């Protein structure tokens, strides 16, 4: 079968879980690139995986058919997958030996004209879950100018966020914005300052993050891991955006911190026993030169790994 999406850092992910025995949770199954590679490389791993994209789920079920006795697939968002499994008594999370999350949009979603992720798309959607109520068309046409400015500044770090929001507000006052390529023309496709990425691309990224509540979803996932019954497991998270990477980095630092006393305390009074594990990647793992030749979209990917030992 034709594979529509190249998973980033596939070999590095496989290497992280290669010696584990037990149950792995793939919180972002996508088109099963990582899961199928892990199952092929390690016969001692079983996987529970989820995704909320029906197109991805349909494809993945066919792709992993040869591993059907070792993988179970669920329709769920990654932020509530662990609580879903626990609440429905589907499994005991203390048996989990690994968790994988790839917090990014697949190449197929980006390239699919109907999904509205691309600057050249005739649609204006950007929903990862087609059943979700909020889409990019609503954000662009109905959010206030100040809310648009906030999104562009917070989620894309655009210093000209005010001007971009004004362009959109002025345009939509006369005509509803209905396509991504129309929006890209309004914003402008010139590169932002000295960066090798266009202003429109960054603005689209910000809108996508807002539509899918991506930062909130990531924080909820990390909360669910922290508050779960998981005892011994490797947590591997791939991000594609500096804000997402910062969230993961800071949460891992928190998890590795034994003393949680305020910095002005002269001595520890908390028991110095609050760490739930250790960071396995001092610096994030990034794509090799060989991978970048095959998949330029892997350039912004960062993989961080934490080992829980409670």
Swiss-Prot record:
Entries under Pfam families matching the protein: Methyltransf_5 (PF01795)
Origin superkingdom: Bacteria
Cellular component annotations (GO), alphabetically ordered: cytoplasm
Subcellular localization, as worded in the UniProt entry: Cytoplasm
UniProt keyword rRNA processing, yes or no: yes
Binding site for S-adenosyl-L-methionine: 32-34, 51, 84, 102, 109
GO molecular function, one term: rRNA (cytosine-N4-)-methyltransferase activity
First-level EC class: transferase
Reactions the enzyme catalyzes: cytidine(1402) in 16S rRNA + S-adenosyl-L-methionine = N(4)-methylcytidine(1402) in 16S rRNA + S-adenosyl-L-homocysteine + H(+)
UniProtKB keywords: Cytoplasm, Methyltransferase, rRNA processing, S-adenosyl-L-methionine, Transferase
Enzyme Commission number(s): 2.1.1.199
GO BP, one annotated term: rRNA base methylation
Function: Specifically methylates the N4 position of cytidine in position 1402 (C1402) of 16S rRNA.
Family to which the UniProt record says this protein belongs: Belongs to the methyltransferase superfamily. RsmH family.
UniProt name for this protein: Ribosomal RNA small subunit methyltransferase H
Species this chain originates from: Campylobacter hominis (strain ATCC BAA-381 / DSM 21671 / CCUG 45161 / LMG 19568 / NCTC 13146 / CH001A)
The gene coding this protein: rsmH
